[in-house]
A protein has these predicted regions:
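A generic structural motif
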Residues: 57-61, 151-152
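Residues immediately flanking
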Residues: 48, 83, 155-157
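Short, structured beta-strand-loop surface elements
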Residues: 63-124
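C-terminal edge-of-domain segments
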Residues: 1-7, 113, 117-212
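A structural signal for short, well-ordered beta-strand segments
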Residues: 50, 107-109, 151, 155
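An N-terminal domain-cap segment
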Residues: 3-58, 69
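A generic structural signal for short beta-strands and their flanking turns/coil linkers
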Residues: 31, 46, 53-55, 73-77, ...
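General beta-strand recognition
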Residues: 56-58, 78, 161
Length: 212
């Protein structure tokens, strides 16, 4: 498959979307990606935190990782992000499925070495995980920044694929006495748990209170 068609959806093409706004909306709704690439002929898939910066994804990891060093050499890589919105429960086993939003992006990653850019990106990561949290915690110091690998992945080609709606049962199954429909899923927050060594005089901050 050549680079011009590598991102084209092959199965159920009506669910594909190549509009960058639609793609970026999905990317902005998550912060965990699976990054795949090959190093010395061996394929790898690494789960990584990310935050979008324009047409780039900033990927966060440890400077000690040999795999991240390989990825930072500019080799071809593929990033996948998936959000499951509902279980699709059909009248037949065959038509059970899931409603989802997904993005597959192709490109190359290069290391970010500027400490100021690294520091700003780490703040972005923290706020992507929990909006407002960056202002409530200490920024990374020079030693921590030096120990952090930050990769800038340029999105060259990308596609979104979205399934929504009811199960698609066979018409002959509509009269069966089996329930069919959707079981929506939602990622949420539970009650915060303070660290065991936290000063008891420190109250739960606004960013942690807000979503719980």
């Amino acid at each position: 498959m050549d680079n011009a068609t590598r991102h084209k959806v092959q199965r159920v093409r009506k669910r594909a979307n190549y509009d960058r706004t639609a793609i970026y909306n999905i990317l902005d709704a998550s912060w965990l990606a699976h990054v795949s690439f090959a190093s010395d002929g061996q394929p790898f898939v690494i789960p990584m935190l990310y935050v979008r910066d324009g047409d780039d994804l900033l990927l966060h990891g440890s400077i000690a990782s040999r795999l991240l060093k390989s990825l930072g050499e500019g080799i071809e890589a593929c990033v996948c992000v998936t959000i499951v919105d509902a279980l699709v429960l059909a009248r037949s086993h065959f038509h059970h499925s899931a409603n989802y939003r997904s993005v597959v992006a192709f490109g190359n990653a290069t290391p970010v070495t500027d400490l100021l850019e690294k520091s700003a990106a780490l703040s972005g990561f923290v706020d992507a995980m929990l909006p407002g949290r960056a202002a409530e915690a200490r920024p990374a110091n020079r030693k921590e920044l030096a120990a952090t690998s930050l990769l800038r992945f340029r999105i060259v080609d990308a596609s979104a694929k979205v399934r929504s709606g009811d199960p698609i049962d066979e018409p002959s199954d509509h009269s069966l006495p089996h329930w069919a429909g959707l079981l929506p899923l939602k990622q949420g927050y539970e009650k915060p748990i303070s660290a065991a060594d936290l000063n008891p005089e420190i109250n739960t901050p606004v960013s942690v209170h807000a979503p719980s």
